[in-house]
Amino acid sequence: MDWDQDRSSTELRKEKSRDAARSRRSQETEVLYQLAHTLPFARGVSAHLDKASIMRLTISYLRMHRLCAAGEWNQVRKEGEPLDACYLKALEGFVMVLTAEGDMAYLSENVSKHLGLSQLELIGHSIFDFIHPCDQEELQDALTPRPSLSKKKSEAATGRHFSLRMKSTLTSRGRALNLKAATWKVLHCSGHMRAYKPPAQTSPAGSPRSEPPLQCLVLICEAIPHPASLEPPLGRGAFLSRHSLDMKFTYCDERIAEVAGYSPDDLIGCSAYEYIHALDSDAVSRSIHTLLSKGQAVTGQYRFLARTGGYLWTQTQATVVSGGRGPQSESIICVHFLISRVEENGVVLSLEQTEQHTRRPPQLGTSSKKGIPGNSLDPPAPRILAFLHPPALSEASLAADPRRFCSPDLRRLMAPILDGPPTAATPSTPQAARRPQSPLPADLPDQLAVGLENAHRLSTARKNKTMETDLDIAQDPDTPDLEMLAPYISMDDDFQLNSSEQLPKVHRRPPRTARRPRARSFHGLSPPIPEATLLPRWGSDPRLNCSSPSKGDPPTAPLTPRTRKRALAQSSEDKGLELLETKPPKRSPRLEPGSVLLPPLSLSFLLQGRQLPGNQPDPRAPLVDSHEPLGLAPSLLSLYQHEETIQSRNHFLPAAGLAQTH
């Protein structure tokens, strides 16, 4: 019995709860229905709104009501017929009012013609949900109030001009798509940042209550038309042009001759910045930067220079058009709208407005000097004419010293002709008499080929003579070979163990009549390979054996007891290469800066030695012991005066020797 009573009470409570929720929902629906009918929309539109849309539109309506009541909106004249219907027809865009947070408080009805989205779908939403992510920072900067930069004027700048990319569901044919398939459309927005102070209200206690001012951004958004959608007759106040990405003219309409005085051929290849007033170049540059980043842009009013002087106020709509794949196929199509006629006619503001200024580089004519071999070294044509025909100079001054008026390349080329062949100067012959008379500039082109031929002949004769001298020296059997000399080792970084006061005098080599052979790559030709008898290999030359000295070697003096000569074993070429484990003996430390190179000695002369009696060479023994000093032949020691002691193989002396030296 008790259980039935508890069950009935629980069901009664649930039934009451359901009835209360049903009544609450019905009341909420009735209130929202009343709100929907109070909104300034048609009944057919408001009847299909959901609860969230009704709340969103109601909040936006309350914001606009406060805004209209706070500002100058309520001061509408009652006289005359209303012009609200004509405003939207006159505008090429739609009106949008944004709050400081970025919510769209109001949009005009014609927004659907430009974006494809209805007015009810956008009002109350945040604009950041419908613009490109890269443009959000720019819009946030436009919504931020800017302080005044002038001390005299306390009012801050309220004007705003920027471009936005908003979502559009319209296709090129005018059909509407789903919001998920929307594309980006560039809108040029211009307007002002307004701050309206609401009217003062009194509190129930009787004290006045103030509210913060209402800030909003009122914009007129205009869609930039694509050049393909324009009708061909643009009218007399507009002309079309095509540019490369660096704003150089590639095409221009013929109507520019009527409005500005230029012919299309004068503009092709020139930059558009050359025909813009200098004070407007910064604003146009910012518009071009917007064009390259967003694809479309509209410039402000700027001054386009006229041909005969003065300027025209112009506004340009630019679009980046791609003709194929890659950035090289892209071009910029500009539609220029003239706002005024030519102002300040006759005032020259740029070089492009002068008759003397040539906009294109002059084309060089074909000259008849193609057969002259020296033309490839000459500078461009204006520089050549300046050297051949200098202004305000007589022919006598040119003939006196023609080298003064020649370019460096021409002077180097004609040096054999102007200077003449090197001859022995006599005391009775003056210098001016030995120099040949230079031809006049007028006769120079005709005699240039002959002079070049003589110069070539002279240089060839000198080269052959030098090569014959070098070959004779190289074939001389008494001349030492450079490849067989000991390598030069600089002693600049070694320590000077001897004091400067005890330095002996350097033995100077007697002057030689025959020159040393040049390097093999000096003339581009290698000297002939000497005979095998002149280039003995290591261990294969019989003259290297101490038991049988060669006939041409100089006699050696008796050795001192402190020195011992190392004998070279006579073996085959392979054994000589394997047994050789030492370097040629080094010379004494550098004495003076003048004594740099050793005298040219052959390898057999440097390594000549005599075997001590009672010692037989061991073929398997190393040639030189690293712990024993390397002795030099007396013939080599005789090259250095006051140097009779034998130097150790190492560069540094022991401590005892160092103490004795000092």
Swiss-Prot record:
Compositionally biased region (Low complexity): 421-433
Which region ranges are annotated with the description Nuclear localization signal? Answer: 75-98
Q: Note the InterPro entries from the entry.
A: bHLH_dom, HIF_alpha-like, HLH_DNA-bd_sf, PAS, PAS-like_dom_sf, PAS_fold
Q: Which residues carry this modification: 4-hydroxyproline?
A: 487
Cross-link Glycyl lysine isopeptide (Lys-Gly) (interchain with G-Cter in ubiquitin) residue location(s): 463, 565
Q: What does this protein do?
A: Acts as a transcriptional regulator in adaptive response to low oxygen tension. Attenuates the ability of transcription factor HIF1A, EPAS1 and the HIF1A-ARNT complex to bind to hypoxia-responsive elements (HRE) located within the enhancer/promoter of hypoxia-inducible target genes and hence inhibits HRE-driven transcriptional activation. Functions as an inhibitor of angiogenesis in hypoxic cells of the cornea. Plays a role in the development of the cardiorespiratory system. May also be involved in apoptosis. May act as a tumor suppressor.
Q: What is this protein called?
A: Hypoxia-inducible factor 3-alpha
Gene assigned in the entry: Hif3a
